């Protein structure tokens, strides 16, 4: 990347060139060049509008548009030289345009500042990123629905405090993650609505003296509405913070899911098997099969949390309007979007390939007195107050711990020593199937409800 030229667009009032280190220190082109497509898109719309209001001729507009399209092709072919001395993506493209088409290229920036230009670029870029992320969320949710449908009757232990609590189905467990991702989807859709306000036309901070048509530019760029205040237009980064907030919540969900997958693949659980293509080995221990994908996603969540805090800290002390501080908004935003999209892609590929180990999960559900609440509910139906039933079953569990017997393994005589309300029909209640089937209401773990929830989920995805 060249640094041997000094051709800043703002050099007129300066008596000496910028220090070479300062030029590198203040340049952003090393990372904001990824905005090139959206920068060119915004410039084409701006040139089109300038021609409509008579600031440019139609011929000048056409020359500019052709030049910008050629530059985009150069960039995408890898034939474009990014120059640090030109600071950023905007000036690199404008300088190249002027090289190609001459003085007409210098007219493109009429009625525009880099302040509103970059604010527009970032919004256009993030809008596209959100659309890609939403697609990955949907793909992951489709995988979860597939697992839930296949495993609607697969019983596993449900946990609280990571201790066995009650039996649930694996399908029901997968649907819990589906629900969280649905909220993530909604948050990102809402974020997209608020970012889709056009700042272009705000110029440096106060607007412009040219007779611009912001409504036309807004329509050309696909924004929903023109921003209503030029000061806010160039200085607002709420949309980036809101995106990083939504991304942080989504990554928190993926991190929690990752923790479960890491536990479930361990020798201590062995609930699931991950295909080899999602794992790696050890350079010293031949037996190792490490769940690197969920471990990395769990770790990468911290990067996105950091991006959120970085942007909040970046903005908290800035007066209106634009400040150079805002150059620091891009790297955390870019990284947060990349990390979330890659993590979702990894999960969307991996989740459909998970293979539950049915026998092991069932055996685990049989341990830990997982049907104790069912016994208490059984006694409630016999007319006893729940708190009394809770204490009765607590004594039965204590007896089970001492004798090494689960509730279903005790004889009727053993159970009746805790309550004479217990009859032979209690054993149907104490089975794993009896427990999950009894929770047959919307949101419950019964297989019938799992299948109904899958249908609702499929309808939700089809309506997007």
UniProtKB/Swiss-Prot annotation:
Its EC number is 4.3.2.1. GO terms for biological process: arginine biosynthetic process via ornithine; L-arginine biosynthetic process. Keywords: Amino-acid biosynthesis, Arginine biosynthesis, Cytoplasm, Lyase. One of its GO terms (molecular function) is argininosuccinate lyase activity. Pfam families: ASL_C2, Lyase_1. It is an enzyme of class 4 (lyase). One of its GO terms (cellular component) is cytosol. It is found in: Cytoplasm. Pathway: Amino-acid biosynthesis; L-arginine biosynthesis; L-arginine from L-ornithine and carbamoyl phosphate: step 3/3. Its main location: cytoplasm. SUPFAM superfamilies: L-aspartase-like. It catalyses: 2-(N(omega)-L-arginino)succinate = fumarate + L-arginine. InterPro entries: Arg_succ_lyase_C, Argininosuccinate_lyase, Fumarase/histidase_N, Fumarate_lyase_CS, Fumarate_lyase_fam, Fumarate_lyase_N, L-Aspartase-like. Signal peptide: none annotated. Belongs to the lyase 1 family. Argininosuccinate lyase subfamily. This is Argininosuccinate lyase.
């Amino acid at each position: 990347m060249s640094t041997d030229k000094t051709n800043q667009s703002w050099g007129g009032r300066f008596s000496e060139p910028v220090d070479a280190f300062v030029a590198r220190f203040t340049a952003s082109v090393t990372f904001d060049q990824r905005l090139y497509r959206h920068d060119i898109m915004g410039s084409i719309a701006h040139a089109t509008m300038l021609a409509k209001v008579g600031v440019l001729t139609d011929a000048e507009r056409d020359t500019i548009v052709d030049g910008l399209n050629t530059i985009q092709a150069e960039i995408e072919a890898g034939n474009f030289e990014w120059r640090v001395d030109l600071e950023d993506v905007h000036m690199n493209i404008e300088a190249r345009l002027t090289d190609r088409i001459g003085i007409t290229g210098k007219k493109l920036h009429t009625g525009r500042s880099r302040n509103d230009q970059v604010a527009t670029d970032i919004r256009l870029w993030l809008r596209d990123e959100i659309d890609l992320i939403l697609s990955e969320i949907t793909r992951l949710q489709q995988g979860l629905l597939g697992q839930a449908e296949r495993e609607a009757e697969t019983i596993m232990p449900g946990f609280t405090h990571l201790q066995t609590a009650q039996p649930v189905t694996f399908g029901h467990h997968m649907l819990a993650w589906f629900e969280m991702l649905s909220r993530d989807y909604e948050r990102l859709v809402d974020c997209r609505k608020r970012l889709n306000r056009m700042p272009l036309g705000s110029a440096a901070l106060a607007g412009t003296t040219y007779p611009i048509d912001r409504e036309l530019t807004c329509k050309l760029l696909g924004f929903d509405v023109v921003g209503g205040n030029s000061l806010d237009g160039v200085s607002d980064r709420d949309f980036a913070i809101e995106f990083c907030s939504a991304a942080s919540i989504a990554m928190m969900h993926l991190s929690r899911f990752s923790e479960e997958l890491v536990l479930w693949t361990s020798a201590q659980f062995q609930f699931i098997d991950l295909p080899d293509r999602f794992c790696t080995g050890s350079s010293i221990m031949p037996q190792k099969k490490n769940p690197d994908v969920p471990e990395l996603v769990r770790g990468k969540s911290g990067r996105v949390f950091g991006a959120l805090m970085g942007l909040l800290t970046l903005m908290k002390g800035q007066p209106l309007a634009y400040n150079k501080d805002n150059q620091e908004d891009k790297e955390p935003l870019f990284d947060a979007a990349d990390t979330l999209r890659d993590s979702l892609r990894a999960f969307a590929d991996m989740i459909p390939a998970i293979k539950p180990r049915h026998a092991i999960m069932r055996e685990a559900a049989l341990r830990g007195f997982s049907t104790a609440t069912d016994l208490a509910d059984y006694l409630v139906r016999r007319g006893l107050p729940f708190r009394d039933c809770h204490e009765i079953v607590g004594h039965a569990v204590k007896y089970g711990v001492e004798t090494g017997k689960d509730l279903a393994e005790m004889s009727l005589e053993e159970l009746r020593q805790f309550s004479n309300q217990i009859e032979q029909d209690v054993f149907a209640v104490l089975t794993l199937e009896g427990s999950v089937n009894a929770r047959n209401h919307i949101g419950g773990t019964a297989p019938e409800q799992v299948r109904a929830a899958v249908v609702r989920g499929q309808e939700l995805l089809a309506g997007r």
